[in-house]
């Protein structure tokens, strides 16, 4: 059932009306927004429907919204849910488009310069462009993003000034259209028609807009007038509909008008002269020669093509900012009255605070040793105080708000009652001495009735040992750790839900934003070791992973009860008591969460393709930093593996190894091998 609200462009799909604490939470948050509160906190327990509450607040407020999540996995989950709540509105996804990213760096101790190397996910790049397009074009927009939103992208005013507006009966020559598309960084290719490409056949120009995944536009000119505009399917060529106007957006966020580029080139030349004078005065001749050679090459590319590799390092000059000013980011594209929701704020807020310094220390080496001009330091993420200054009205969303939210919340809205009547898990404390044997017997009980178990340990070593031990005793177990990429992590969670295995072992499971209704037991080993992984907030988050199951239980293995444990157990008991009282008062019988098992990043990643691209990019980067001796060893090893594969008739494997070998030999000998 769809519902609409006065003066709101959103149509909210409401499968059921708000229940439990949701109606009160929605009303109080809307009241806070109307009263002009800058910050509010939604303290919502696991399984209380925080995402549904957010969707209701967005629909009732009727303003564009930005939802920031701590990682790609959670962002994908939120994006999928928001698309279900707002199927007729613009729900967009803005995360880092790198499947793999090796930033430019210099290691002075080894005199080693590492070139920037990356593997860009085309589909996510298209979604990022679609996100900024929606923000510029419409009010009914919800953007789900990660901390990637605080990194510099092109200036909104430059980006907007480069838009090509096509209207029926407008006067426009074929040459003018082609020139404009070239300025917008579209490539002409009459053979391979893909995103960011146009093709020309006489007076017919086909354009595949960079922000569209499945629609292209055909422009038919007659006597230097736009005669007709048709949307068509780029794969089949089938005409979809005739339109009277169409807006083509630039193919990159870094696109810049020609006059701005020429102005920037002059400013870069001035900075280069000043920097070279400084190097000569300090007798740093190698650095001076290196900087001049690299910068002049970039300037030549910018004069000829309008852009160069690593153009983002000149973003300060291109946007006309002063030294030290913040770069334009996604937040600059937001409307002035937009709303911001920071999901899992206890993690996300600290992430935002940590980005600037890590980026700065890497770039300082590049500047000191003549690889980049000092202005490259201004191609950076926002500092925390700059982010604060740009924040629109904000709602922090967390089950365990941190100190920052407590200090900044105009009001704290609690959502402790679950509409399903589910009660917080029973928390038990058991001795450490017998923790592994006790865990084994608990696991067997749960597996026998088709339930799943999460186990969290303190160290990687212990997680690996425990996984091996459980596997030896016939338990179907997997191990989740930081080396597993986003796509594989999502698949492991999906496999656990499907019953491919029964026990998932990890170190910091709470970070993964796990939403697994099938989990009935969470076991926390060494719960009495005070520290980040066993703080009150971490314990509450981890205990909450069992809160979506009727028989949810959390076992804390400890020889003493620490202050953090005491507070976490006390808070869980308080929430249990409130839910039980609500259930009794309203005659509710708790029922488990039934959630369709689907790939939560459907439409965001092609899992197999992403994994293959990522692996190839990582291997290539690994080869580039190897010395000659290591490369020779690797060549011999791969040659042997290739011959063995061919002997065993594994020809596909042999072909992959052959390609790796060609790449290695090209690196080793500096030439491509001929067939």
UniProtKB/Swiss-Prot annotation:
InterPro entries noted in UniProt? Helicase/UvrB_N (IPR006935), Helicase_ATP-bd (IPR014001), Helicase_C-like (IPR001650), P-loop_NTPase (IPR027417), UVR_dom (IPR001943), UVR_dom_sf (IPR036876), UvrB (IPR004807), UvrB_inter (IPR041471)
Chain ranges of the Helicase C-terminal domain:
435-601
Q: Which GO terms describe its molecular function?
A: ATP binding; ATP hydrolysis activity; DNA binding; excinuclease ABC activity
Q: Name the Gene3D superfamilies for this protein.
A: 6.10.140.240, P-loop containing nucleotide triphosphate hydrolases, UVR domain
The chain positions of domain Helicase ATP-binding read 31-419
Q: Which residues form the UVR domain?
A: 632-667
**According to its record, what is known about the domains?**
The beta-hairpin motif is involved in DNA binding.
Q: What is this protein called?
A: UvrABC system protein B
